[in-house]
Amino acid sequence: QRGYQWEDTIVKRFKKTENWKAFRLGSPSIALPDVLAVNTKQSTIFTIEAKSGTSTSLPVPADQIERCLEWIKTFDIYKNKQVLLAFKFLSKKRIDVGVYKNRELREFFKIWDETLEITDCVCTYDGKIYSKINGERKELDLKECKMPFKTKQRTSA
């Protein structure tokens, strides 16, 4: 449910932005990115994997990154093609079952680096991204995407 709302929010923000179109692509049972956003004037396409939650870290499985990459590769007519990992840390942090603590709502839109090996990865509340290989975490230097709409992105952590 939360994931759906976050995807819906992203789509609505793009739709309110001039020259952008965005769509939710489907259910979790189908191997599609969560959101597809295009700007034909700027020849730009984003495939977006959206994650939201109340924990201190949000994981993205490797296969979800892979399917986003597969999708943008099929749209070779676009000059700018990027996979974005969109993270929303809700303003309530879950401490225990049914127990929450207030915190700042944070959003991060990270650009997947296509030169990297595709791995499971995780984004932390401070906006750092780590790959997870055989249980070991390694920090990844993924750039923050400047979105064409207003966000709760932090310019510096």
Where do the language-model regions lie?
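Domain-level recognition of nuclease-like catalytic cores that cleave nucleotide substrates
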Residues: 1, 82-157
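Acidic-basic catalytic patches of nuclease active cores, encompassing PD-(D/E)XK
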Residues: 1-26
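Acidic-residue sensor for enzyme active/binding pockets
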Residues: 7, 49, 64
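Conserved catalytic cores of phosphodiester-cleaving nucleases, focusing on short active-site segments
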Residues: 14, 35-37, 44-54
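Short, solvent-exposed loop/turn segments that connect beta-strands within catalytic domains
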Residues: 40-44, 77-80, 92-95
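Short, charged, amphipathic alpha-helix that recurs within catalytic cores of restriction-modification
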Residues: 56-85
